[in-house]
Amino acid sequence: MITMHSLVFLFDVDNTLLDNDRVQADLAEYLSRTFGVRDCGRYWEIFEDVRRELGYADYLGTLERFRLENMHDPRVLLMSSWLMDYPFGDRIYKGALSAVQHVQQWGPAVILSDGDAVFQPRKVDRSGLWAAFNGRVLIYIHKEQELADVERFYPAKRYVMIDDKLRILNTIKNSWGERVKTVFPKQGHYARDPHILATYQPADIQLDQIGELSNCPLAAFTSNGGGANFP
């Protein structure tokens, strides 16, 4: 039986709980060392093409296309192992797991992420986040379009959405209104992009890093209004 909660906390993964910019930097270093700068650049060109087509980052799908251009290079066959066996747990932000534990005293914490059906679940599992969230994991293509499904699995009177992308936070705020409190950890390249910061409305709560969520009292998530900064 599904329980109606007073409050549910929804967490993004990449650059919210886990330093995905560092993962990409490590991948770029591996590609440059293994294949050279030119082919490294080509991988990321394909990556962006695939992202535009699908609407999410697809590292393994990019690898499939990269392989077609390097069919006779057996080193390509090792790339999937590098990706799938990457030590994602080493990239969890300091204080992230404590922050998740902190908010769970008031309601369940749920991962709400975008991505493919293989690599993104592997990242969540291998990083230890799947266990930290007790298996409460939702991964979509466009999560901001799946709020009805979120409500079906985790019905609540109010939600808190923690994400490094203001576009996502703005879209969810427009859909749920005062039922959601948006939290913006200023981590990763999207959170520092001047154009993005100028284009979208600020979140209800802004954090310099995800660990600061542990400083937030319950009232920060349940009171009307916004504009708070912590600590």
PLM segments and residue spans:
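Asp-based, Mg2+/Mn2+-dependent phosphohydrolase catalytic module
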Residues: M1-H5, R126-M161, K165-P231
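Active-site neighborhood of HAD-like aspartate-dependent phosphohydrolases
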Residues: M1-E45, L68-E69
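Conserved Rossmann-like nucleotide-cofactor binding loop
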Residues: T16, V23, A117-V118, R167, ...
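Generic enzyme active-site microenvironment
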Residues: L10-D12, L112, M161-I162
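Conserved SAM-binding loop
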Residues: L17, A109, M161
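Short, acidic loop-to-helix structural element flanking the phosphoryl-transfer center
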Residues: L60-G61, S81-I111, E144-A148
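A metal-dependent, Asp-based hydrolase signature
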Residues: V23, T34-R38, F47-M84, H102
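Substrate-recognition/cap helix-loop segment adjacent to the acidic, metal-dependent catalytic center
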Residues: V100-V110, D114-L138
